[in-house]
C-alpha cells in the first residue's frame, strides 16, 4: 500500500515554542506580509518517499493526474493499492481510470482523517526540521531535498 499526500511549506516557518520567565506569557511578532509558499507532494511506501515533487503553484486536478500517472505510477509494482485522501483535486473520476489502466487500485480515506495516513507524520517531521534548519538554505526546495536525502 502506498499513501499519497501533499503539504504546503514555506522558508520562514515560525517556531512552535520559546522561552520566557515563569509566569510571563511569551509573544512573538509575525509579519503581515504574504510569504512565498511551496507545495510538496509524494508517495510513502514502507518508510520510503517516492516521486517527491516540490513546486511553487497550487495543485489542481489536471496537474495532480499528470504527476500521478507519469511520476508515481512508474515506480509502483503491479497490483499496488494507492491510498488517497479526499482533497478536491483528487479526481474520483480520472484517478481510478489511470490506476486501473496500470493494474493498480485506489482506496479513499474517510473525510477528515489524517490520522489514518502515515505520510502526515512525514510532513510533520519535515516541518519540524525546516523550522530549525531552513534559515541555512537559499530556498525551500534545497532545504526539503536536503531533509529527505540526509
Descriptions of predicted regions:
Residues 1, 118-150:
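C-terminal anion-handling pockets and recognition modules
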Residues 1-69:
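Extended, low-complexity cationic-aromatic segments
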Residues 3-5, 42, 68, 85, ...:
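Mobile genetic element proteins and their domesticated derivatives, centered on retroelements
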Residues 7-10, 45-49, 88-90, 112-115, ...:
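Short, solvent-exposed loop/turn segments at secondary-structure junctions
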Residues 25-35, 100-118:
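RNase H-like polynucleotidyl transferase catalytic core
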Residues 63-81:
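Short, basic/hydrophobic alpha-helical segments
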Residues 78-91, 117:
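Acidic/histidine-rich, metal-coordinating catalytic segments
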Residues 92-102:
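Short, aromatic/basic amphipathic alpha-helical patches
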Amino acid at each position: 500500500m502506498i499513501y499519497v499526500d501533499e503539504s504546503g511549506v514555506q522558508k520562514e516557518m515560525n517556531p512552535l515554542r520559546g522561552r520566557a520567565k515563569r509566569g510571563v506569557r511569551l509573544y512573538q511578532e509575525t509579519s503581515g506580509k504574504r510569504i512565498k509558499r511551496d507545495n510538496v507532494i509524494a508517495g510513502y511506501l514502507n518508510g520510503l518517499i517516492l516521486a517527491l515533487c516540490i513546486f511553487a503553484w497550487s495543485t489542481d486536478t489536471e496537474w495532480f493526474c499528470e504527476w500521478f500517472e507519469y511520476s508515481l505510477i512508474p515506480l509502483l509494482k503491479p497490483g499496488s493499492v494507492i491510498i488517497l485522501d479526499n482533497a478536491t483535486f483528487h479526481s474520483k473520476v480520472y484517478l481510478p481510470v489511470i490506476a486501473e489502466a496500470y493494474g493498480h487500485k485506489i482506496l479513499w480515506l474517510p473525510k477528515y482523517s489524517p490520522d489514518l495516513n502515515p505520510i502526515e507524520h512525514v510532513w510533520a517531521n519535515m516541518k519540524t526540521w525546516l523550522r530549525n534548519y531552513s534559515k541555512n538554505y537559499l530556498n525551500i526546495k534545497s532545504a526539503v531535498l536536503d531533509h529527505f536525502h540526509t
